[in-house]
Amino acid sequence: MTTSLQDGQSAAGRAGAQDSPLAVQVCRVAQGKGDAQDPAQVPGLHALSPASDATRRGAMDRRKAKDLEVQETPSIPNPFPELCCSPLTSVLSAGLFPRSNSRKKQVIKVYSEDETSRALEVPSDVTARDVCQLLILKNHYVDDNSWTLFEHLSHTGVERTVEDHELLTEVLSHWVMEEDNKLYLRKNYAKYEFFKNPMYFFPEHMVSFATEMNGDRSLTQIPQVFLSSNTYPEIHGFLHAKEQGKKSWKKAYFFLRRSGLYFSTKGTSKEPRHLQFFSEFSTSNVYMSLAGKKKHGAPTPYGFCFKPTKAGGPRDLKMLCAEEDQSRMCWVTAIRLLKYGMQLYQNYMHPSQARSACSSQSVSPMRSVSENSLVAMDFSGQKTRVIDNPTEALSVAVEEGLAWRKKGCLRLGNHGSPTAPSQSSAVNMALHRSQPWFHHRISRDEAQQLITRQGPVDGVFLVRDSQSNPRTFVLSMSHGQKIKHFQIIPVEDDGEVFHTLDDGHTKFTDLIQLVEFYQLNKGVLPCKLKHYCARMAV
C-alpha cells in the first residue's frame, strides 16, 4: 500500500512539473540550454526535493521487488546464453569476452631475400618473434633463434633488426603510404652473438670503464655491465658525421653514454665543456646503411644512422659512418644494449617464453611429440640397439649420407660410365645445386654482402662458382669480423677428379663431402664451418 501511494505521488509530481515554467527552466539548465544558472539560485527548486526523493525511493522499491521475484524463480540454466537478450546478460557477455572482440586483425606482407612474399593476417598485438615463429612452422624451417625480421626502408637505403619483443603494428604505424618499405625475413646469426663472444664486438681500444670499475674488468663482462643500472662502459672512437642540410661529412671523436651520443669539439677531449650532444636513442632507432656511399656520399661503406621513431623523411636522418665494419658493429650493438637493456637479454635467454600469436591460429610453436621421441638406431648387427653416444650417432648419420649419395651417383650414371668426366661433373652439379649453402653464379661482392646481412660471426659460409677460374669453386666464410675466400682446387688422381683446399693433402669426391669434413674439422681454415648462408623463400 505504501508503494502504490508513493507511485501516485511521484506520478502526480511529474504531471504537475511538466506544465510549470520552473520545470522547463530546470530542464533547460540540465540540458545545457539557455543561461547556465546555479541550481541553488533557481527559485522554488528546493520545493521539488521531497518529491524527487520519493520518486527515487519508489523506483528502488520496485527494483527490489523485481529482484525478489527473480530470486524466487527456479534456477534453470540457459543452454544458449549468447542468444539471451536480457540487458544483464549482454553486459556480462561484454565483460567476459572483451578480447575476442577487441583483437583486431591486420594483414602484413613479409619478403624473403629472393623477393618472394607471403601475406599474413595477424592480430594487432603480434610481435616480431610471433611472425618469425609462424613462418618457421609454415615452411618447416629449423628454429635456431637466428631468424629475424628486418625493417627495410627503400627510399633511404637503410634497414634495422626488428627486436623479437617489438609489436609489428607499432612498427608499421610509422610508415608512410608513399614509401616502398618492406619487412624481410632472413637469418641473423649476429643478433645475440655478442652475449656469447663479446670480445669480437667490443674492441679493447673502443671501450673504457669508469675509474672505480677498472680493477679486473675484462671484455667478456661488457654485456653484463651494460645491463647494470648503476654502471656502464663508455664507447668512444672516430666517426664521420654528415652535417645537417649539407652533403659534406665531418670527422669527429664520439662518446656513447646512457644519456645519448656526444662528439668532442676539441680533439679527443671528453671534458663536459667540449662535448656537444648529437643524438639520443630513446625516441629513435638505429639503422644500418646499405648504400651510404651511393645515396649519401659517405666516405666509407660502413654507415649507420639515427631515425626518429615517428615518421620522418631523409632530412631527419642523422648519418654516421665508421672506418671499418667491426667498429660499426660495436657502435650499433652498444646502442641496442643501452636502448633495450634487460629486455634484450630476456629475448636471448627465453625465446620460447614470448607470447606467441601462433597459438591463436592453432599452430604450436614446439615440435611434435613424435619428432622429439626419435632416437638413433644401429641395425648393422643381429640385434638392433639405441645409439646413446651423440658423437657416434653423428658419425653414423654422416656415413649413411655418404652411402646414399654414392648410390645416387651410380643411379644417375647408369646410362653411361659413372667415372666419365662429363657424366661425373653433371652428377656433381646436380647434387651441389640441391644444397642450401651452394649459390652457383654469384660474384665476390654479392657473397660478401650476403654473409654480412646474415651476421658476420665466425663460421658463416657459402660455396659459389669461381669467376676467375672456370669449372672451379670458392668457399667464402667469415672469421674475426672479416670475409675470407678460399679457392677449391680440382685435382686428378687415377683418372678421377677430386676437390681440395690444401693442394691435394685432403681430397673429396664432391663439395658435400668437403663441407661436411670442415664442419667437423678446422683443417686449413681459420675455424670450423658453422652456419651456412641460404636464400630461403617464405
From Swiss-Prot:
Domain Ras-associating: 104-190
Keyword vocabulary terms for this entry: Acetylation, Cytoplasm, Endosome, Membrane, Phosphoprotein, SH2 domain
Post-translational modification: Phosphorylated on serine residues. Phosphorylated on tyrosine residues by TEK/TIE2.
Region (Disordered), start-end ranges: 1-73
Skewed-composition ranges (Basic and acidic residues): 54-69
InterPro entries xref list: BPS-dom, GRB/APBB1IP, Grb14_SH2, PH-like_dom_sf, PH_APBB1IP, PH_domain, RA_dom, SH2
Any one of the GO BP annotations: intracellular signal transduction
Domain SH2 span(s) in chain numbering: 437-533
A molecular function (GO) term: protein-macromolecule adaptor activity
Annotated PH domain residues: 232-340
Subcellular location: Cytoplasm; Endosome membrane
Sequence positions bearing N-acetylthreonine: T2
Purpose: Adapter protein which modulates coupling of cell surface receptor kinases with specific signaling pathways. Binds to, and suppresses signals from, the activated insulin receptor (INSR). Potent inhibitor of insulin-stimulated MAPK3 phosphorylation. Plays a critical role regulating PDPK1 membrane translocation in response to insulin stimulation and serves as an adapter protein to recruit PDPK1 to activated insulin receptor, thus promoting PKB/AKT1 phosphorylation and transduction of the insulin signal.
UniProt remark on domains: The PH domain binds relatively non-specifically and with low affinity to several phosphoinositides, the best binder being PI(3,4,5)P3.
Similarity-based family: Belongs to the GRB7/10/14 family.
Protein's name in the database: Growth factor receptor-bound protein 14
Organism: Rattus norvegicus (Rat)
